[in-house]
Amino acid sequence: MAADSEPESEVGCPLTPLPPVSIAIRFTYVLQDWQQYFWPQQPPDIDALVGGEVGGLEFGKLPFGACEDPISELHLATTWPHLTEGIIVDNDVYSDLDPVQAPHWSVRVRKADNPQCLLGDFVTEFLKICRRKESTDEILGRSTFEEEGRVADITHALSKLTEPAPVPIHKLSVSNMVHTAKKKIRKHRGEESPLNNDVLNTILLFLFPDAASEKPLDGTTSVDNSNPAAEAGDYTLYNQFKSAPSDSLTYKLALCLCMINFYHGGLKGVAHLWQEFVLEMRFRWENNFLIPGLASGPPDLRCCLLHQKLQMLNCCIERKKARDEGKKTSPSDSMTKAYPADAGKAGGQLGLDHLRDTEKEKGEAGKSWDSWSDSEEEFFECLSDAEDLRGNGQESTKKGGPKDMAPLKPEGRLHQHGKLTLLRNGEPLYIPVTQEPAPMTEDLLEEQSEVLAKLGTSAEGAHLRARMQSACLLSDMESFKAANPGCCLEDFVRWYSPRDYIEEEVTDEKGNVVLKGELSARMKIPSNMWVEAWETAKPVPARRQRRLFDDTREAEKVLHYLAMQKPADLARHLLPCVIHAAVLKVKEEESLENIPSVKKIIKQIIAHSSKVLRFPSPEDKKLEEIILQITTVEAIIARARSLKAKFGTEKCEHEEEKEDLERFVSCLLEQPEVAVTGAGRGHAGRIIHKLFVNAQRAAAVALPEEELKRSGCPEERRQTLVSDFPPPAGRELILRATVPRPAPYSKALPQRMYSVLTKEDFRLAGAFSSDTSFF
């Protein structure tokens, strides 16, 4: 193409000679073949589970990255902004326009449309479970675990009543953990199951690492706090998302179910693993093995409900384990400690009562009776009465009766109060051992609130509500009375609620200033609940009181709740944990790349998720928005890594060049078009040039041999065919001139013509101006 004076002819220039025409040319070259820069990301292989690795990632962590190169094309625009007409030749045979010599280079990247990103796909597929309606039984086939269990219990009911002996289990392993469960499952599901044994055992070992220990399980929970900074950040997230700590069993279970759902069995695999998990929970409850990966203490209401339920079950196991361990203590030893040899001489009835109480205490604190025997409250009371009868029989020969009753002896003391003494007898005030409050999950608290609200605002309803809420108060009063014989309500209030005992200085008859105290106004209200409870309370130490927390009943409620969960319910419970894990993953990956725009999006994701996940049953649309944001971040990070690999940022020998390249890559991610500093002679320009050269050489090697044989030596022919750049995908020209129009004496005005030529298209556009004065 030889540049001519098209603008002058178009505008009908009346001048001779014609004014000069300025030409700007831009050629665009497209790079699609990246050659050695292939995309290495491969989908995880579930078979690698058994080896402890999945897709090159540590098992238990979500995978990350795109399965295809997220950068599909690179567009290089070489620009000659100021050329003079008549000196440039550009045609099919020859061209003066060498891209390497162009003074300006700019680059655009074309992104792959919706690249498959592993993390986004994992979370999206897990969300789909929430929309399923099937129950676990419908998915796996009707199970009769419970029916077989009932038959076995009924068959051995009498033997359990007459021979209450704990089953000795010295070591727990994966094999005996799931052996019985697998036998029962196979009866109803056939020999094939969604998860094979290797995968299942690996997952169970990951969830329950204590099962692999050669030592007997001591039931201690293990929480890894090796990284305090990370733990602090994670605390903020799980608190905001209402999920679970990242080292907890609930969090690990969510990751396992997410991976199984995506790669191994889908919904069936999820149902299978969940059923195994529930069986494991019952096994641990029945055999007093604490659940690992759960913080000790009452349920954490900041976590998801499923995590709270597992913590509640752990609390039940702790209480049951304490009772069973207490039961192993020999009767003679415990009686010697609690009942001195000369106690019976002081009064036979007191001795008998004390022995009965001691026996009852052992029944409370150390009861094993297999798993079912304390499954209902009436069973527990009957067993306690049986022990009372046994105690009566043993002590029937002792002398004494009601007339020989001795003064009450203090029981259940924790330690002496530092300052206070009893008001009536001046004895030191002792702080009693009290029962711990019953742990509660958020759904139990809601139920309790509903019951209390239904009592209404009447006087009777208010009184009943107060009595229901004062069970713990009554227990503490009884413990206080047992620890402090001769005490009064004022003594209890001074310890339990000091602000309700008002002291003031007064002058006595002798003129001395003394302290005089009295109960507060609210304690003097008629029919005060505290006064009623104090009058009702008997001096009974905590160890002999009726339990505030029936661990057996609560454990069975939790196990029933777990067994009734459908996969959709389970996914709803665990989705906050999965999103929590996904956010932690993108934060971890972003920290390696340091992309400012991604940091901003992650903050938006956290803020959005905190609002959505704090409430039960969030809308699917809002959840999808969160997942879309996570996928967007994943794609941006994948693009950054793709560009860094292509431009070889890690191979730079000079730190300055490396920083320039990283800045260039960052701009490519965030801007539609980026200028190349130094054009073809700069560091980035040389890399781009090399990319095109490699692609051209590969294209020449792939040419058919027939074309190489047409003329001359193959090597010579190949050399003539190979150029550094392919033919331009697009040619753009802008012709500019300043011409007086429409008359020679008109004002000289700018004239512009634009043309673009591609393989499929040719466009021509002009912008011409005329002097309108006097015309």
Swiss-Prot record:
Transmembrane segments: none annotated. GO terms for molecular function: GTPase activator activity; guanyl-nucleotide exchange factor activity; small GTPase binding. The keyword Membrane does not apply. InterPro entries: Rab3GAP1, Rab3GAP1_C, Rab3GAP1_conserved. It comes from the Eukaryota. The keyword Phosphoprotein applies. Residues 324-351, 386-414 are annotated as: Disordered. Keywords: Cytoplasm, Endoplasmic reticulum, Golgi apparatus, GTPase activation, Phosphoprotein. Belongs to the Rab3-GAP catalytic subunit family. Catalytic subunit of the Rab3 GTPase-activating (Rab3GAP) complex composed of RAB3GAP1 and RAB3GAP2, which has GTPase-activating protein (GAP) activity towards various Rab3 subfamily members (RAB3A, RAB3B, RAB3C and RAB3D), RAB5A and RAB43, and guanine nucleotide exchange factor (GEF) activity towards RAB18. As part of the Rab3GAP complex, acts as a GAP for Rab3 proteins by converting active RAB3-GTP to the inactive form RAB3-GDP. Rab3 proteins are involved in regulated exocytosis of neurotransmitters and hormones. PANTHER family: RAB3 GTPASE-ACTIVATING PROTEIN CATALYTIC SUBUNIT. The Rab3 GTPase-activating complex is a heterodimer composed of Rab3gap1 and Rab3gap2. The Rab3 GTPase-activating complex interacts with DMXL2. Interacts with LMAN1. This is Rab3 GTPase-activating protein catalytic subunit. It comes from Rattus norvegicus (Rat).
